[in-house]
């Protein structure tokens, strides 16, 4: 790749080697006045990741300064994400970087996608239909399963694909989508990197800005750290699902996923969730544990969130909504709000109790 493409795809091995050859240590990357634009861009791409989309510039091959800024902003953004070391941020960042690459890959020539796939140790053979001249790729089914398994659309299921002699035929855009998944996994699994404490301290002006945006986004998504699981504060849909499980009702797959991912996200352990399904009529502990560990990200590092309220309604899983349901968009948002209200009331009561004690007449 030329330097312009390395800047657009900074996660490839060649880009890492090129940056290493420039001799920019983390300390120099942080302190050099000449690299201020790279630091600003590095912070910007993390904030853009929180918003869901990293905007990639398109510098010409002659704009060496802009190319270097974009190229060096990537390792600096990784430093910032690592210093904050928040799983939610790491997942959002990796996904946004991968999505940005996907949009670019769709415009590239087939040979470029083939070369990029090779960097991920994926053998994608180019095939041209002799009659229509359409371009396809042949991908070994093991590579296909590895990359397509997290994708939810039924079209990605192996049983719905054409396979010949162990190879799956896919379109150029489909290969770009699978490469997006490979990119996401590479970035997510490589974070956090080890960053010296003094470097993280020097990054505080940048990480504070990102952390502020991170907390806003967590509130929006209903993501937070819960001190303990409070079942009396669950949204009606989850309460009903748990009641059905305890009554021996076999939940639909979509509701089972929603309930499991909700419980994992509020802090229940895999063992605790497995125990809840122990009464289910089709209970298979090994299979159940595998499914729950997958949702919890035990092996992949990706913890799945429960579906939004709109999706719950679409699948018929929204049951007995109450007044609070009208003001939230996500089951985790419902739970977060009720936890916040309960904590606020407890704090107010404790404060009032202290004030009352101070105003009491001491015994005579």
From Swiss-Prot:
One GO cellular component term noted in the UniProt record for this chain: primosome complex
GO molecular function annotation: 4 iron, 4 sulfur cluster binding; DNA-directed RNA polymerase activity; metal ion binding
Cofactor: [4Fe-4S] cluster
Keywords: 4Fe-4S, DNA replication, Iron, Iron-sulfur, Metal-binding, Primosome
Presence of keyword Glycoprotein: no
Free-text remark on how the cofactor is bound: Binds 1 [4Fe-4S] cluster.
Residue numbers binding [4Fe-4S] cluster: 237, 309, 318, 325
Region (Disordered) residue spans: 345-364
Subunit: Heterodimer of a small subunit (PriS) and a large subunit (PriL).
Function: Regulatory subunit of DNA primase, an RNA polymerase that catalyzes the synthesis of short RNA molecules used as primers for DNA polymerase during DNA replication. Stabilizes and modulates the activity of the small subunit, increasing the rate of DNA synthesis, and conferring RNA synthesis capability. The DNA polymerase activity may enable DNA primase to also catalyze primer extension after primer synthesis. May also play a role in DNA repair.
Annotated protein name in UniProt: DNA primase large subunit PriL
Species for this entry: Methanococcoides burtonii (strain DSM 6242 / NBRC 107633 / OCM 468 / ACE-M)
């Amino acid at each position: 790749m030329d330097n312009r493409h390395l800047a657009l795809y900074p996660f490839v091995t060649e880009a890492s080697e090129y940056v290493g050859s420039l001799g920019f240590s983390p300390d120099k990357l942080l302190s050099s006045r000449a690299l201020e634009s790279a630091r600003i861009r590095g912070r910007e791409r993390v904030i853009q990741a929180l918003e869901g989309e990293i905007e990639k510039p398109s510098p010409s091959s002659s704009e060496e300064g802009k190319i270097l800024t974009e190229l060096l902003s990537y390792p600096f953004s990784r430093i910032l994400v690592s210093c904050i070391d928040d799983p939610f941020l790491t997942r959002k960042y990796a996904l946004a970087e991968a999505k940005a690459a996907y949009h670019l890959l769709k415009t590239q020539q087939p040979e470029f996608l083939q070369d990029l796939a090779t960097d991920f140790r994926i053998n994608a053979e180019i095939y041209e239909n002799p009659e229509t001249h359409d371009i396809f790729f042949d991908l070994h089914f093991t590579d296909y399963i590895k990359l397509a398994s997290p994708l939810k659309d039924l079209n990605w299921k192996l049983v719905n694909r054409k396979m010949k002699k162990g190879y799956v035929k896919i379109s150029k855009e489909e290969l770009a989508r699978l490469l997006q998944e490979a990119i996401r996994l590479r970035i997510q699994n490589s974070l956090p990197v080890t960053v010296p404490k003094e470097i993280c301290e020097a990054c505080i002006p940048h990480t504070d800005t990102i952390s502020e945006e991170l907390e806003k986004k967590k509130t929006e998504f209903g993501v937070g750290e819960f001190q303990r699981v409070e079942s009396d504060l669950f949204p009606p849909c989850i309460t009903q699902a748990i009641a059905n499980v305890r009554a021996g009702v076999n939940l639909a797959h979509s509701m089972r996923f929603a309930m499991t991912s909700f419980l994992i996200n509020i802090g229940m352990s895999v063992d605790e969730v497995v125990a809840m399904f122990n009464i289910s009529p089709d209970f298979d502990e090994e299979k159940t544990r595998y499914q729950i560990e997958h949702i919890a990200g035990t092996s992949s590092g990706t913890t799945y969130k429960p579906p939004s309220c709109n999706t719950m309604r679409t699948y018929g899983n929204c049951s007995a909504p109450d007044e609070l349901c009208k003001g939230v968009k996500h089951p985790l948002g419902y739970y977060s709000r009720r936890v916040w209200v309960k904590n606020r009331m407890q704090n107010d009561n404790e404060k009032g109790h202290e004030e009352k004690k101070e105003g009491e007449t001491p015994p005579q």
